[in-house]
């Protein structure tokens, strides 16, 4: 989860740097940007699927309904709050931002903006996916996800964003669910993960140089990258890493707020004439992580304002009173 979050921040940050012409759009940037998009969002879906299967049990229609209500609140509140804030800021400062926004209703319901489209997509995946109870259910779920992915690859998706994003990403979510059945003690050799990572990097360079954009190749590369990252992280889980543990507590705030901090700081620095790429990168990346973490800490102290990030946590707190 931390790796995926860091890569999302890096992807959005360097895209903004290139669009602002602070750093050049060269081969190194283009390769890096293309490569992380093979797998950083799939990693998020895999993590979500794993947690869903591990901690949820959907046995009947009542369980499904209660879970959907819970997910609607948990995903919907931060989705709407931060999408609206982003829309307002980009509309007010249209001349200073890199991307133009469509109408508010279209942004919220038809074409969600980055990075919040992930929450939008995840809700619809929860809507159609139930936890499996046995091997038969598991195989049916895998077959369902494969069929959706195959249709997405063959057709390029449909005109409705919610359907297209579910077709493309259901497979990653189901892979995460299936990870709950894997004996992770057998994945204790981190060198296997490192070897897979090296193979992925080499293949990603080849794909970039040959300009390969085939959907199936992209999926295979993404799968290889996800397996390598997961293998490395699982094999290293016995080692205490305070930094990773600390950042893991704030992945949601970082995901939600990194662009809201990075973009204004970039604009202010440019207004001050500080266009040096090193200064922009150091300060921009620092605020992308420090800003959301500090905000989350402040919101946690106030308890109830934390509702915009963790609504179900605050609701539970209110019910105890």
Put a short name on every predicted segment.
Residues 1-321:
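Alpha-helical transmembrane segments and their immediate juxtamembrane cytosolic regions
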């Amino acid at each position: 989860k931390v790796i995926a979050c860091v890569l999302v921040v890096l992807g959005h940050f360097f895209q903004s740097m290139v669009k602002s012409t602070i750093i050049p759009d060269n081969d190194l940037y283009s390769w890096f940007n293309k490569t992380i998009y093979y797998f950083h969002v799939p990693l998020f879906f895999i993590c979500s699927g794993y947690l869903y299967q591990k901690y949820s049990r959907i046995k009947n229609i009542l369980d499904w309904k209660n879970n959907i209500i819970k997910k609607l609140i948990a995903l919907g509140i931060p989705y709407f709050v931060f999408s609206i804030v982003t829309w307002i800021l980009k509309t007010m400062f249209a001349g200073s931002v890199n991307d133009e926004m469509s109408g508010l209703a279209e942004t919220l319901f038809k074409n969600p903006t980055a990075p919040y489209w992930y929450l939008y997509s995840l809700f619809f995946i929860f809507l159609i996916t139930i936890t499996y109870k046995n091997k038969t259910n598991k195989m049916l779920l895998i077959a369902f996800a494969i069929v959706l992915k195959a249709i997405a690859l063959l057709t390029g998706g449909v005109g409705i964003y919610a359907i297209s994003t579910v077709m493309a990403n259901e497979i990653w979510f189901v892979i995460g669910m299936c990870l709950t059945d894997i004996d992770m003690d057998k994945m204790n050799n981190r060198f296997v993960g490192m070897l897979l990572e090296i193979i992925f990097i080499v293949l990603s360079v080849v794909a970039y140089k040959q300009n390969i954009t085939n959907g199936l190749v992209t999926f295979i590369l993404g799968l290889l990258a996800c397996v390598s990252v997961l293998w490395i992280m699982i094999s290293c889980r016995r080692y205490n890493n305070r930094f990773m543990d600390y950042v893991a507590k704030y992945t949601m705030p970082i995901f939600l707020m990194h662009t809201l901090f990075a973009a204004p700081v970039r604009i202010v620095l440019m207004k001050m004439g500080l266009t040096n790429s090193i200064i922009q990168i150091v300060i921009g990346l620092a605020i992308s992580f420090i800003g959301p973490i500090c905000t989350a800490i402040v919101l946690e102290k106030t308890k109830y304002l934390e509702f915009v990030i963790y609504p179900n946590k605050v609701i539970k707190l209110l019910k105890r009173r």
